């Protein structure tokens, strides 16, 4: 699994003009699933993201986690994270999991986050979505369960 993680002051996702998910301070996570991913990958990244110390303490140092701050997560599925651009001019998405496999792991990922006590908002899997966010910092990280 791959994630693009952004620390945000707010974020929302809209589908067909209607807000599907909206959060205040927390993390906006774009979530990609590949063929070899398992529930262990989802569990590893769920634990990592809620404990990742990317929020400022009273001294302005990144010492606090999402759990420490009571922040929220906006989780948006994005198969394009597995796009290959080495050859040609059009991305190749062969490394992205098939939709049925990706949906199961994406839903498991969100469930694991909720089990950790985090409020999770989502987009709509497979839909064309508009994502709005205010990146705080900016802080943006790429996480991969295989690396």
Curated annotation (Swiss-Prot):
Hydrolase among keywords: yes
GO MF term set: D-tyrosyl-tRNA(Tyr) deacylase activity; Gly-tRNA(Ala) deacylase activity; Ser(Gly)-tRNA(Ala) hydrolase activity; tRNA binding
Compartmental location: Cytoplasm
Applications (biotechnology): Confers the ability to grow in the presence of 20 mg/ml D-Tyr and 500 mg/ml D-Asp to B.subtilis, showing it can be used as a selective marker in bacteria that do not have a functional copy of this gene. Can also function in an E.coli MG1655 dtd deletion, although in this case it confers resistance to toxic amino acid D-Tyr but not D-Trp (D-Asp is not toxic in this experiment).
Domain of life: Bacteria
InterPro entries: Daa-tRNA_deacyls_DTD, DTD-like_sf
Pfam families, per the entry: Tyr_Deacylase
Subunit structure: Homodimer.
Protein name, entry field: D-aminoacyl-tRNA deacylase
Organism of provenance: Bacillus amyloliquefaciens
Gene: dtd
């Amino acid at each position: 699994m791959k994630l693009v993680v952004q620390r945000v002051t707010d974020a929302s996702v809209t589908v067909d003009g209607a807000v599907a998910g909206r959060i205040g301070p927390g993390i906006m996570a774009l979530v990609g699933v590949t063929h070899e991913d398992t529930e262990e990958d989802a569990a590893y990244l769920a634990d990592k993201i809620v404990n990742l110390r990317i929020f400022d303490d009273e001294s302005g140092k990144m010492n606090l986690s999402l759990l420490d701050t009571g922040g929220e997560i906006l989780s948006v599925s994005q198969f394009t994270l597995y796009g290959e651009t080495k050859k040609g001019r059009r991305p190749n998405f062969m490394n992205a999991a098939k939709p049925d496999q990706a949906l199961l792991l994406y839903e498991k990922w969100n469930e694991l986050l909720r089990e950790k006590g985090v409020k999770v908002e989502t987009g709509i899997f497979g839909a064309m979505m508009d994502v709005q966010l205010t990146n705080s910092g900016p802080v943006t990280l790429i996480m991969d369960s295989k690396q």
